[in-house]
Amino acid sequence: MAEVLSSLDALSVANEAPVHVQKLDKFGRAYATGKRKDAVARVWVRPGTGKIIVNDRPVEVYFARPVLRLIINQPFAAAAREGAYDVVCTVSGGGLSGQAGALRHGISRALTFYEPELRGPLKKGGFLTRDSRVVERKKYGRAKARRSFQFSKR
């Protein structure tokens, strides 16, 4: 009887939700990667004053359009942590919009590694989900992915 109860206890432990703990490097930073379209962002987050450095340049210089900076700051707004963390990241591939989306994804993941209790609000906002939409490939016999060549009946 005792071994049956112990096996049931083992099953109930296996079915519990995973416990998320801090994942920090030796410098006290949380590291994560974010992806969007063809862009990949490597992100390091640590407590600070809210500075964001992208490819060794301030975010205001790298992302000149305000809407892109708004996209990058969305995870901090959703978690109510504006100005609480410094971000250092390298971004490569894709265009500016894809890079901003990759940075948003990476910042969100790094925040959950630093503060696991933020996982709920960030997941509810959709920041932890990898946006899988990519450009549709061009097909032969067509002008673009879906557009056909001009057709003349006569």
From Swiss-Prot:
The record ties this protein, via PROSITE patterns, to: RIBOSOMAL_S9
One GO term of the biological process aspect: translation
GO molecular function terms here?
RNA binding; structural constituent of ribosome
The question of whether Ribonucleoprotein is a record keyword is answered with: yes
Supply one GO CC term from the record.
cytosolic small ribosomal subunit
Output the InterPro entries linked to this UniProt entry. Ribosomal_Su5_D2-typ_SF, Ribosomal_uS9, Ribosomal_uS9_bac/plastid, Ribosomal_uS9_CS, Ribsml_uS5_D2-typ_fold_subgr
Say yes or no: keyword Ribonucleoprotein present. Answer: yes
Which UniProt key words apply to this protein? Ribonucleoprotein, Ribosomal protein
The record's similarity note reads:
Belongs to the universal ribosomal protein uS9 family.
Report what the protein is called: Small ribosomal subunit protein uS9
Organism equals Azorhizobium caulinodans (strain ATCC 43989 / DSM 5975 / JCM 20966 / LMG 6465 / NBRC 14845 / NCIMB 13405 / ORS 571)
Query: What gene name is listed for this protein?
Result: rpsI
